[in-house]
Each structure stands twice: as structure tokens, then as C-alpha cells.
Design a protein with these regions (language model features):
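Conserved N-terminal beta1-alpha1 strand-loop-helix module at the mouth
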Residues: 1-90, 107, 156, 167, ...
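Conserved beta-strand positions in the central sheet of alpha/beta enzyme cores
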Residues: 22, 47, 71, 93, ...
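Glycine-rich beta-to-alpha transition loops that act as phosphate-gripper elements at the mouths
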Residues: 24-27, 72-78, 94-97, 114-119, ...
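Catalytic cores of alpha/beta
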Residues: 34, 77-87, 120-128, 145, ...
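A charged, well-structured terminal subsegment
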Residues: 141, 150-153, 201-202
């Protein structure tokens, strides 16, 4: 899967809902009900970050839930790509971009949403064929004003900004012409996960899925 094909696949996923939940899950036993709650609320594309020992098992469990598309986030090395695929991930997300990660994704045919924070990084990825990128860490590197400015000289690159995105500021990102969707953790906060408040998470997901209405 070359970069052009990867970006086409990622773009189709980004257009399924305005928000991709960025999930940090410690307990694989709650993976399925968490996924079901988010999907019920209208968020069907789920990013499970590889930040916990159980993350790969969480991906495997969430992949069993109908109606969702589960990917692996926080891919930081080539071996993560193989592990993610073996766990059942259908796409990958990286905070930054290295040759090793991009090559592994191409060889293993895993669509990747590669991370970039500067115009130079964005241009390098675009020249490789990645027309859809993760803008990270969005708020820390200038937020919506920076992303809007980048769209001037680089109008053909589309983004999923992530990092510091909240329900309160998500809409202003989504109204930018170069933003396809946003990544956010607010739809599945730690306290609701720990309390197994699936109804509460569904409500947050529903509000996020309807944020542009």
C-alpha cells in the first residue's frame, strides 16, 4: 500500500465521523463495552493508543465489535506496525513520522495517519504522497490559527488535528477547509471508563458526532 493509497483509505475513515476517539485503556475486559458505547453514540472509528501494556489486547477485543473500525495509535517504531496488525488494527496513527515506520506500513499494507507539526514535516510527507496527516500536538504548536495558515501554501493537504482538542474548541477546527476530523480523548474520559459509565460515554460520543449540526 503506497502513501497515496494509504491517504485515500485514511481520508475515507476520517469522513465517517467528525471525531476519532483517542483511547488509553488499561483493562482489556472493558474494551468491548467501551467500543460499543462509542459506536452507539455515532463514533465508529476508534484509535487505541499503544500506551498501556494491555493496548494490543484491547485492540483485539474492540475489533470483535460490529460497526466499528479500530486502529492503533502512538506507533513509534516499526515493530509496532506488525504488532498492531496482528492484534487486528485496520489503520495506524503516529505522533511523528520516521522512515522506518512509513516503510513498515507500506510493506505490511497498514494505512497510516502520519504525524507532523511543522511546514517542513508536512511538506516532506506530502512529497512522499501522504495527502492526509495528523497535525500534532495541535494546540501546543499554534492550534487552529496555525492550521489555517498552513492551508494557504499547502491547500492540498488535509488534517486530523490531535492534542489539546476539546468539545469546546473542536468545532472551530472542523470548520477549517483543511480539517477532515479531529482526534480527542474527551469522549472517553478516565473517570467514566473506571466507573463503567457506558451511558455517559455514549452521550459524549453522540454530542461529538453531532458537533457540526
Amino acid at each position: 500500500m503506497n502513501p497515496y493509497e494509504a491517504s485515500k483509505k485514511i481520508e475515507s475513515l476520517c469522513r465517517l465521523a467528525p471525531v476519532i476517539p483517542v483511547l488509553v485503556v488499561d483493562d482489556a475486559n472493558i474494551a468491548q463495552p467501551l467500543a460499543e458505547a462509542l459506536i452507539k453514540g455515532g463514533l465508529t472509528v476508534l484509535e487505541v493508543t499503544l500506551r498501556t501494556p494491555s493496548a494490543l489486547q484491547v485492540i483485539s477485543e474492540m475489533a470483535k465489535v460490529q460497526g466499528g473500525v479500530v486502529g492503533a495509535g502512538t506507533i513509534t517504531k516499526a515493530s509496532d506496525v506488525t504488532d498492531a496488525i496482528n492484534a487486528g488494527a485496520q489503520f495506524g496513527v503516529s505522533p511523528g513520522s520516521t522512515d522506518d515506520i512509513l516503510e513498515a506500513c507500506e510493506q505490511k499494507k497498514l494505512p497510516i495517519l502520519p504525524g507532523a507539526a511543522t511546514s517542513t514535516e508536512i511538506m516532506k510527507l506530502f512529497n512522499l504522497g501522504f495527502s492526509v496527516q495528523k497535525f500534532f500536538p495541535a494546540e501546543a504548536v499554534g492550534g487552529q490559527s496555525a492550521l489555517k495558515a498552513i492551508g494557504g501554501p499547502l491547500p492540498h493537504v488535509k488534517f486530523c488535528p490531535t492534542g489539546g482538542i476539546t468539545y469546546q474548541n473542536a468545532k472551530s477546527y472542523l470548520q477549517l477547509q483543511n480539517t477532515l476530523c479531529v482526534g480527542g480523548s474527551w469522549v472517553a474520559p478516565k473517570n467514566l471508563i473506571e466507573n463503567k459509565d457506558w451511558h455517559g460515554i455514549t452521550n459524549l460520543a453522540k454530542a461529538a458526532s453531532e458537533i457540526l449540526n
